[in-house]
């Protein structure tokens, strides 16, 4: 009798499990189909500014400054994001000698030309934490002595072209409205509300939560062995494009980094120092662009959407070399902290576009001014 009961219970549970799996697969198929239907081309090739964006931008500025105040370290005011640098290093960006004429735009207009640059490598968090903690990793590249009119009036005469990137191809927010909500939740210490702002399931951003979790990846072996993406789009002459900087070990001497002690708080800085300063081995990258195909789902205004390489491949426009150097000194680290990077430190040919870049224009400038003013008062 007892044996019969357990057999029937096992049979019933097996059927229930099969039904659950079937329903799960059906739900996944329906969700995938709906997502594919919603996210199909063509898309706009021009910016589309939603109503209320300016007001939301002002709210975001105040929240970003609040975060700067919260994460003040000792007597210095840090960035509201990517506060901890692994170092600022000198670099050279050489345009390909045989660059396709269609790709000769802006700072890439002259084949073979070499730009002197500064590269800042960083963790993504607003608070300096151990490198072993899961986090985004950033690269900012500042080309120097770039001729032409700068987009920002305050930048005239500085001759800079910045590329700002981090190590994931898409962002965990779509637009300014979502960014305002996300950063406000983080500033209030209520991170769960960043993706689940209310009990209304229609407001839940589960897909964006998974993007955020993927962004908070385990630490790389070295900042020099990581691929970085612009996430947001830019003009590339008359085209729209995203950028990527990827390691290019074939262009540098063969090198195997000694195993680092990842229990140390700054092991990524140590790894960079080991390669460039101790072993005197350069690091090499390629700088690539991905041009928008407006007939495919490659939107300008939604940074949570990854532009698929099957729709538009990345094309190499330049090689980036970080020569062997000494960079980890108190004076150089202070100079690194005082540097400002922004997508809007740019010439017209590489104008930032899309909502997140419009937001950056105001927020980066306001936070930079606030931070440098407060630090100058110390």
Task: Give short role names for the model-derived ranges.
Residues 4-25:
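N-terminal Sec-pathway targeting helices
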């Amino acid at each position: 009798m007892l044996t019969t009961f357990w057999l029937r219970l096992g049979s019933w549970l097996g059927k229930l499990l099969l039904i659950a799996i079937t329903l799960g697969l059906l739900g996944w198929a329906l969700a995938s189909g709906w997502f594919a239907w919603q996210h199909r081309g063509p898309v706009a090739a021009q910016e589309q500014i939603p109503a209320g964006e300016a007001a939301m931008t002002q709210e975001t500025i105040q929240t970003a400054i609040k975060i700067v105040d919260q994460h003040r370290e000792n007597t210095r005011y840090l960035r509201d994001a990517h506060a901890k640098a692994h170092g600022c290093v000198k670099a050279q960006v050489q345009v390909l000698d045989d660059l396709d004429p269609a790709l000769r735009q802006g700072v890439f207009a002259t084949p073979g030309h070499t730009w002197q640059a500064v590269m800042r490598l960083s963790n993504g968090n607003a608070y300096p934490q151990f490198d072993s903690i899961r986090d985004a990793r950033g690269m900012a590249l500042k080309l120097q002595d770039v001729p032409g009119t700068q987009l920002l009036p305050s930048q005239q005469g500085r001759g800079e072209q910045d590329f700002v990137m981090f190590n994931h191809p898409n962002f965990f927010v779509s637009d300014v409205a979502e960014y305002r909500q996300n950063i406000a939740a983080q500033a209030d210490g209520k991170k769960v509300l960043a993706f689940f702002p209310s009990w209304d399931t229609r407001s839940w951003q589960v897909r964006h939560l998974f993007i955020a979790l993927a962004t908070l990846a385990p630490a790389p072996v070295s900042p020099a062995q990581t691929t970085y993406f612009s996430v947001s789009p830019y003009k590339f002459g008359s085209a729209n494009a995203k950028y990527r900087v990827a390691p290019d070990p074939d262009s540098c001497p063969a090198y195997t980094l000694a195993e680092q002690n990842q229990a140390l708080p700054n092991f990524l800085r140590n790894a960079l120092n080991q390669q460039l300063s101790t072993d005197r081995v350069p690091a090499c990258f390629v700088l690539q662009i991905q041009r928008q195909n407006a007939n495919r789902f490659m939107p300008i205004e939604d940074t949570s959407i990854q532009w698929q390489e099957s729709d538009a491949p990345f094309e190499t426009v330049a090689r980036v070399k970080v020569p062997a150097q000494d960079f980890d000194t108190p004076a150089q680290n202070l100079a690194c902290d005082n540097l400002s990077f922004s997508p809007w430190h740019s010439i017209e040919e590489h104008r930032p576009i899309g909502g997140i870049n419009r937001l950056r224009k105001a927020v980066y400038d306001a936070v930079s001014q606030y931070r440098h003013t407060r630090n100058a008062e110390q």
